[in-house]
C-alpha cells in the first residue's frame, strides 16, 4: 500500500491534489487538505497524520520545497521520532527552479527546511527539469548541480529523474513520465 499525503499547504506550483484521479488509477491513496483544489486559500489540515504514519505500507509526504512548507511537517516531528530509522527524508532539487538558483542558495535552504521540519534530510533527489523542454543536456547540467549541492551539504544523491525518451547515462537514473498539467 502506498499513501501520499499533501502537506504542501503553502506553495501551489505543483499541486499534488490536482492528480487525485491519476493516483487512484495507480492504486495510490491520496490524502489532501480539506480545501485543496478550491478557490479558498486556507491552509487547513483535516486528517490525522500521526495515525496514517502507523498504517502498513509506504507513506510519502509532500511538504513543498521551502522552509515555509516544512513548518507543517515540523508539527509531527515528535510523533515520527519512534520511526526515525525507517524515514527517508529527501531534499528534492531542481537546478531550474527559482529557489534552487545556485548551489549556494540551494545548499543554504536545506538547513532552514531541516530547522522548520525538525527533521534531518537523508539524501538528495535530483529532479532538475524544464518540463516538456527538458533535454539530455538539461539532465546533465542538473546532475552536475546536484553533485555540487551534495558536496556542500554532505548528503548523498539518491537518484536523478529523467523522462523516458531522454537518453542520459549516470548513476541511479530513474526514468519517469511527465504528468504535470
Q: What are the functions of these language-model segments?
A:
Residues 32-38, 57-72:
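Switch II (G3) loop of P-loop NTPases
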Residues 1-43:
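N-terminal phosphate/diphosphate-binding loop that engages ATP/GTP or pyrophosphate donors
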Residues 43-50:
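A short, well-structured juxtamembrane/interface segment
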Residues 2, 57-61, 87-89:
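Generic beta-sheet signal
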Residues 5-7, 61, 93:
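Active-site flanking residues adjacent to catalytic metal/cofactor-binding acidic residues
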Residues 67-170, 174:
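Conserved catalytic-core segment of NTP-binding enzymes
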Residues 54:
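Catalytic phosphate/metal-binding cores of nucleic-acid and nucleotide-processing enzymes, i.e., regions
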Residues 27, 169-181:
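Active-site regions of enzymes building and remodeling cell-envelope glycoconjugates
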Amino acid at each position: 500500500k502506498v499513501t501520499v499525503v499533501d502537506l504542501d499547504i503553502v506553495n501551489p506550483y505543483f499541486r499534488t491534489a490536482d492528480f487525485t484521479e491519476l493516483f487512484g488509477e495507480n492504486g495510490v491513496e491520496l490524502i489532501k487538505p480539506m480545501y485543496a483544489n478550491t478557490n479558498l486559500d486556507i491552509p487547513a489540515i483535516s486528517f490525522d497524520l500521526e495515525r496514517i504514519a502507523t498504517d502498513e505500507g509506504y507513506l510519502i509526504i509532500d511538504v513543498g520545497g521551502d522552509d515555509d512548507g516544512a513548518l507543517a511537517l515540523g508539527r509531527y516531528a515528535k510523533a515520527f521520532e519512534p520511526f526515525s530509522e525507517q524515514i527517508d527524508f529527501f531534499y528534492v532539487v531542481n537546478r531550474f527552479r527559482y529557489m534552487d538558483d545556485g548551489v549556494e542558495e540551494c545548499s543554504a535552504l536545506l538547513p532552514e527546511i531541516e530547522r522548520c521540519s525538525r527533521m534531518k534530510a537523508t539524501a538528495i533527489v535530483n529532479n532538475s527539469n524544464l518540463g516538456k523542454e527538458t533535454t539530455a543536456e538539461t539532465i546533465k547540467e542538473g546532475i552536475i548541480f546536484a553533485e555540487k549541492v551534495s558536496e556542500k551539504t554532505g548528503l548523498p544523491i539518491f537518484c536523478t529523474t529523467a523522462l523516458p525518451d531522454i537518453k542520459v547515462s549516470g548513476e541511479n537514473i530513474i526514468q519517469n513520465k511527465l504528468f504535470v498539467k
